[in-house]
Amino acid sequence: MIVPSACNEANKGDIAKVVLMPGDPLRAKYVAENYLENPVCFNTVRNMFGYTGTYKGKRISIMGSGMGVPSIGLYSYELYNFFDVDSIIRIGSAGGIDDSIKLRDVVIAMGASTNSGFANQYTFPGTFAPMASYTLLKHAADAAEKIGAHAVVGSIFTADQFYDANSESAAKYREMGILAVEMETAGLYLTAAKAGKQALSILTISDLVFTGEGLTASERQDGFTQMMEIALETAWKSLD
């Protein structure tokens, strides 16, 4: 069946029920080629690569989201509503804010505060709190414990800007217990909530906002490997 999307050339049935979603489409390609068995590419439009393969005998897809709330909002909306995807697991990097957060830590985002206006479209009579699927979150926490990863479950902040003109923002986030900042999760959680589907973000801390410390390219890859193992096990378990 042909799906009415200008951004995804897949047909119904090409995409699995659970999708891993890194921001970088080249990372999606890397994961497909190195972690999935018999990956098949289902999308190349705008170079937003998408693949479906198997992991430990279960069908899993991976597709890039691009950067920012509008981009992940578009791709996740189509996956949920046009391609019958049940669960999306974002995998990406984040900047650590809380003093307890260290480089290479994995943060499992329970909720995502945001300064994005993305939720305005829903005319919700109040301030909606974008939250993860508890089922996916529990699977991820269990997977992290199983492999011995240092994973922290808590709240993050999804920013609409990378370069913030307000130098006090990060300190204000920290005062409210925010662990880390990134640019996509709230959009994913809002889209999932509206569609009645499941979503989770699993993030590697690649830099620390207040100290300026950051991982090298090789160190980022090591941290990414741990995050990927957690995400794959979470996806696999969600298909039980």
Language model features with spans:
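Zn-dependent metallopeptidase/amidohydrolase metal-coordination segment
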Residues: 186-220
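Generic structural signal for well-ordered, non-membrane alpha-helical segments
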Residues: 21, 25-28, 68-72, 129, ...
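Active-site rim beta-loop-alpha module in soluble metabolic enzymes
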Residues: 127-176
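Generic non-transmembrane alpha-helical segments
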Residues: 139-147, 191, 230-238
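His/Asp/Glu-rich mid-to-C-terminal helical/loop segments that flank catalytic regions of hydrolases
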Residues: 209-240
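Metabolite-binding pocket within alpha/beta catalytic cores that recognizes anionic/polar moieties
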Residues: 1-130, 134-136
